[in-house]
Swiss-Prot record:
Belongs to the RRF family. This is Ribosome-recycling factor. Keywords: Cytoplasm, Protein biosynthesis. Transmembrane segments: none annotated. GO terms for cellular component: cytoplasm. The gene is frr.
Length: 185
């Protein structure tokens, strides 16, 4: 049976890993990805609505995203929302769809994105280590209170450390994949 503290640590670390993966997906790279539009909201009848709930977003050609709204009346609203965002892309509205052409990024831009990805992953590592510290503290408290013997406490601490190492390694792998994606032409 898995100890509840180990289970708690694993669940929290897994959530942290998923959060970091989601943040990296939303990051702009040289390739177009519908995920970068997830944070862009359009004022649709007074309600801030994500673009992906108002349109079909697809990748067309090598460096183009095509946004095809289900209701053509929102074309200009989507265009304004993209212009107001910090994506640095110029939407082209042809009356039916909006095209977002991704320019080939410079080496300097790519290096900046890699640096940003590294910062995001570092935040994840810090969160994982904080989870480890929190669980280790609970193990020590349980041991002090006499709820678990010293040998079991040491075994649990080793398990928590092993989990920590495992998740930090996964974060490093996620970073390497993102770095490769950013740097490839």
């Amino acid at each position: 049976m898995v100890n509840p503290l180990i289970k708690e640590a694993k669940e929290k670390m897994k959530k942290t890993l998923e959060k970091i993966e989601d943040e990296l997906k939303k990051m702009r790279t040289g390739k177009p990805s519908p995920a970068i539009l997830e944070e862009i909201k359009v004022d649709y009848y007074g309600v801030p609505t994500p673009v992906n709930q108002l349109a079909t977003i697809s990748v067309s050609e090598e460096r183009t995203l095509v946004i095809k709204p289900w209701d053509r009346s929102v074309l200009s609203l989507i265009e304004k929302a993209i212009n107001a965002s910090d994506l640095g892309l110029n939407p082209v509205n042809d009356g039916n769809v909006i095209r977002l052409v991704f320019p080939t990024p410079t080496t300097e831009q790519r290096e900046k994105w890699v640096k940003k990805a590294k910062e995001i992953v570092e935040e994840g590592k810090i969160a994982i280590r904080n989870i480890r510290r929190e669980i280790m503290k609970k193990i020590k408290e349980d041991q002090k209170e006499g709820n678990i013997p010293e040998d079991d406490a040491r075994r649990l601490e080793n398990e928590v450390q092993k989990l920590t190492d495992e998740f930090i390694e996964k974060l490093d792998e996620v970073f390497e994949i993102k770095k490769k994606e950013i740097m490839e032409f």
